[in-house]
Amino acid sequence: AEFPEIVIYLHENSGAVLNEKLINHQLDMAVIYEHSPVAGVSSQALLKEDLFLVGTQDCPGQSVDVNAIAQMNLFLPSDYSAIRLRVDEAFSLRRLTAKVIGEIESIATLTAAIASGMGVAVLPESAARSLCGAVNGWMSRITTPSMSLSLSLNLPARANLSPQAQAVKELLMSVISSPVMEKRQWQLVS
């Protein structure tokens, strides 16, 4: 209610789609995982989140190794997702094959799939905490190798922000730098 005249529209989509919307001036800004240089888009690193394994059956403990994850049924996003790319890279480096039993983009569908106990998912810590609470499940930090994703604020490179968009950006930056943020939920990117 700090800015009652501003309406925020949230779009959940891949970084590529969001960047395209920025370039075409359909969005003022986007917060995405794992930015890559894109012509026409400026990017500012915000945070880094560790990746966690989330499930409801047979908790592996506070931390889990990729070798153990290779034995589990996985629900992962499609192969263009930053999470999927990071998981595929970790498995490839260890010459392991992931047992992907479903590719799920929707949080509601992923929540139902994890609640069913049929498999586990790899998620950034903030999403893992939320999903874990929703399904009364567990979360384990992926430690060998440790995996994380950086979160970036992307803006159109050649456009000035409207006063409303600038206010939203400033509010976002103040929330990110706030000492009130839950310990270990977010880590500043160095």
Annotate each language-model stretch with its function:
Residues 1-4, 96, 143, 184:
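Proline-centered flexible-loop/turn and helix-kink motifs
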Residues 3-9, 97-101, 150-152:
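Residues at or immediately flanking beta-strands
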